[in-house]
From Swiss-Prot:
Name of the molecule in the record: Uncharacterized protein PH0533
One Pfam family hit: DUF3194
Family: Belongs to the UPF0440 family.
Compositionally skewed regions (Basic and acidic residues) per UniProt: 100-116
Residues covered by region (Disordered): 97-116
InterPro entries, alphabetized: DUF3194, MTH677-like_sf
């Protein structure tokens, strides 16, 4: 079971959303190739879909095809790679939320005439 964690994100720009998808894809690909040689992977497809409404939804879809002689539980490997990607993306989003939160606080302090 997965629980939902409210990070309290500000509105993200298109570039930030693209970066999140890129990070997730890169983590998955790196994880797969940490466990399999490139020659053992016949085909791989990693898709990230991001929807930002009231919440930020990230859907990751991974397909990996290996030859029959490669002894690996592909489904478990994919699940582990996806879990790792979600962990990395969550850390990245927390940094974004913290950074933007601090920027907003600094702007508010400057507007009110207070400084650190």
């Amino acid at each position: 079971m997965r629980k939902v964690i409210h990070i309290g994100l500000p509105k993200l720009s298109e570039e930030e959303l693209i970066e999140i998808g890129d990070i997730a894809q890169r983590v998955i690909i790196d994880y797969i190739f940490e466990h399999l040689a490139k020659s053992e992977v016949r085909d791989m497809e990693v898709t990230a879909r991001i929807n930002q409404g009231e919440t930020l939804d990230l859907e990751l879809e991974v397909y990996v095809e290996v030859p029959i002689f490669v002894r690996v539980d592909v489904e478990s490997l994919i699940d582990e790679a996806i879990d790792k990607a979600y962990e990395v993306v969550e850390r990245h989003l927390r940094k974004l939320a913290k950074g933007k939160g601090n920027e907003g606080r600094e702007e508010a302090e400057e507007a009110s005439g207070k400084s650190k």
